[in-house]
Amino acid sequence: MLYATGVRIGELVNIKINDINRYDRTIKILGKGRKERVVVYGSYCEEALNVYLKNGRIELNKKKCDYLFLNKDGGRLSDRYIRKIIDDVVVKCELDYHISPHTLRHTFATDMLNNGADLMTVKELLGHSSINTTGIYTHVSNEQLKKVYAFAHPRSKG
C-alpha cells in the first residue's frame, strides 16, 4: 500500500477501516499538519487489501480496533514494525540495496511522473503544500526525455 498510494509511513499506520472507500478505491488520509487529503489505489492494491481483510485482519482484530493494520495483539501496527517487515522482505529477496518506506513513496512519485502524471496531481497525492517539494521527484531518465520529445515535438519525426 505504501507504493500503491505514496502515503507516508505515519499516515499508513493511522488509516482506519472507515477511511477506506472500497467502491471508489480511495482512502482518506490525515497528513502532516493534520491536513486531510484523498489518495487513490489500484486493482493490485485492492486484491491485496481484500486478502488481508478477509483473512489476516479478521484473525488479528481481537480488540475490535478501528485501525486498518493490526499487530499480533490486535492493536495498531507501528511504523517501526512496518520498517522491520520491509527489511525482512529485502533480506528474503536477497536484494543488495536498502529499501525504506520513503523509498517506496519516492518510487511512487517518480513512476507517476515518468508515466505521464502532471506535477500538480502528484503534489496533491503526496500531500505536499509546495510544488517545490514535489519537484525533487522530477529527475527524468533519458529514455523518458526521448519518449516525451518524440510524442510532443512537432519536428521530432524524420
PLM ranges: what are they?
Residues 8, 16-18, 118, 129-132:
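Short coil/turn motifs that cap or connect alpha-helices
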Residues 4, 88, 105-128, 136:
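C-terminal catalytic core of tyrosine-transesterase DNA break-rejoin enzymes
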Residues 31-51, 65-85:
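C-terminal catalytic core of Y-nucleophile DNA break-rejoin enzymes
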